[in-house]
Curated annotation (Swiss-Prot):
It catalyses: N-acetyl-L-glutamate + ATP = N-acetyl-L-glutamyl 5-phosphate + ADP. This is Acetylglutamate kinase. It is an enzyme of class 2 (transferase). The keyword Amino-acid biosynthesis applies. Substrate binds at G48, G49, R70, N162. InterPro entries: AceGlu_kinase-like_sf, AcgluKinase_fam, ArgB, Asp/Glu/Uridylate_kinase, NAGK-NC. Catalyzes the ATP-dependent phosphorylation of N-acetyl-L-glutamate. Gene3D superfamilies: Acetylglutamate kinase-like (3.40.1160.10). One of its GO terms (cellular component) is cytoplasm. It comes from Vibrio cholerae serotype O1 (strain ATCC 39315 / El Tor Inaba N16961). It holds the Pfam family AA_kinase. The gene is argB. The keyword DNA repair does not apply.
């Protein structure tokens, strides 16, 4: 991994981290410290499922998931886009600015970064993102700013789409040819006894899914990580944000969670 410092780093932030200002502050502190020390270009991609859940509950709308993915009726996408591209994005940007980071808030559509199409008619306005044109993103990174990208995209027809944030991060990393780290509530993939699995390939993952050891939203995360490892031709790490003091090691190439092998 001698070219590690040269390649950009995409960090996917998700889960309950977005719900706690103290955690976010520690996270951005660790990210800023690493960025300064390594002089590395960093991009954040985020979801914000809990914000969507809160908003749906307030509006008395039901949240439905299919195979770990949120069903997004087309008449609800303006609300969900508002929560993710609006509230969640500005909240993260605000925290980053507070911690001394020059942050720029973006979506998957900006500069044609990702192509987005409907994933499955049964899921509604849920998109699949594929890598697009990273020229604008590269220009922003060249200024030393840190892009913070929501998982809301637009189709070629201008239709708003909600993209799973893990899948969105994979597409952004593909567009940039970047290293990718997926940070979440969990420390990585656990075996049937609750122990962390250090490395995982597609065959092992399929066996764990078939054996119901990997379930629900973790299936989406595992599939996204395996797809990323294949597409990018490099290992992808799934780890927790809960120990900010370990993140510099992780960003520098050490494994602290589960490493997915191409």
């Amino acid at each position: 991994m001698s070219d590690l410092k040269l390649s950009p780093l995409v960090i996917k932030l998700g889960g309950a981290a977005l719900d706690c200002a103290e955690t976010l502050s520690k996270l951005f502190g660790a990210i800023a410290q690493y960025q300064n020390q390594a002089q590395r270009r960093i991009v954040i991609v985020h979801g914000g499922g809990y914000l969507v859940d809160d908003l749906m509950a307030k509006l008395q709308l039901k949240s439905v998931k299919k195979d770990g993915l949120r069903v997004t009726p087309y008449d609800q996408i303006p609300i969900i886009a508002g929560a993710l591209a609006g509230t969640a994005n500005k909240m993260l940007q605000g925290q980053a600015i507070k911690d001394g980071i020059n942050a720029v808030g973006l979506s998957l559509a900006d500069g044609g970064l990702c192509h987005v199409e409907e994933l499955d008619p049964e899921l509604g306005a849920v998109g699949k993102a594929t890598p697009g044109d990273s020229t604008l993103l590269q220009a922003i990174l060249a200024t030393g700013a840190m892009p913070i990208i929501s998982s809301i995209g637009l189709t070629a027809q201008g239709q708003m789409m909600n993209v799973n944030a893990d899948q969105a991060a994979v597409a952004v990393a593909g567009a940039l040819d970047a290293e990718l780290v997926l940070l979440s509530d969990v420390s990585g993939v656990l075996d049937g006894k609750g122990h962390l699995i250090a490395t995982l390939d597609a065959k092992q993952a399929d066996a764990l899914i078939a054996g119901k050891v990997i379930t629900d939203g973790m299936i989406v995360k595992v599939k996204a990580a395996l797809e990323a490892a294949q597409d990018l031709g490099r290992p992808i790490e799934v780890a927790t944000w809960r120990y900010p003091e370990k993140l510099a090691k992780l960003f520098g190439g050490e494994s602290i969670g589960t490493r997915f092998l191409p």
